[in-house]
Amino acid sequence: ALKNLDLNLERGRFIGLLGPNGSGKTTTIKLLNGLLQPTAGTVTIDGMQPGRGTHSIVSYLPDRACLDENMKVADIIDFFSDFYRDFDRVKATEMLNTLNLSSLSRLKALSKGNREKVQLILTMSRRAQLYILDEPIAGVDPAARDYILNTILANYSEDASVLLSTHLIADIERVLD
């Protein structure tokens, strides 16, 4: 699906990976996260091949939910806090409070838009060097899209980069570098 791709992301940049469905955006992101292996060429992040070493510097929001819907939001925050040394529990709680979401809510009791927001909160609560966000605004209403984009802008470090994939180009043009 991908040929002759050369991608160099500078720190502090907000980069869009734009294109129609089926154009290789998710494949690129899976290569960057080590979920797929290239058939030719190499992939490196900060000089390392994607894997355990890069998991500590990359915060990844997949295009599909990967959380147990029976869990309470508080339990998921506990899990992320235990799993990621760079997870900022205070930041996650502040973002939840801004949404008026109870940490005692189970994921399955939340709307699709609010489940997406919880996943985004988890991703953006890490002090990562690279945030890779796969279609974070797909399938949610325009108000949720605005919240998601504003949350990303307000919560990534200027020392970090954001790579956001989408086919909804008009919705994110204003935030891209």
Which ranges hold each PLM region?
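Helical segment within the ABC ATPase nucleotide-binding domain
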Residues: 145-158
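Helix-to-loop junction immediately C-terminal to a conserved catalytic motif
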Residues: 33
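Conserved ABC transporter NBD signature motif
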Residues: 40-54
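ABC-family P-loop ATPase nucleotide-binding domains
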Residues: 63-119, 126
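Catalytic Walker B motif of ABC-type/P-loop ATPase nucleotide-binding domains
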Residues: 131-135, 140
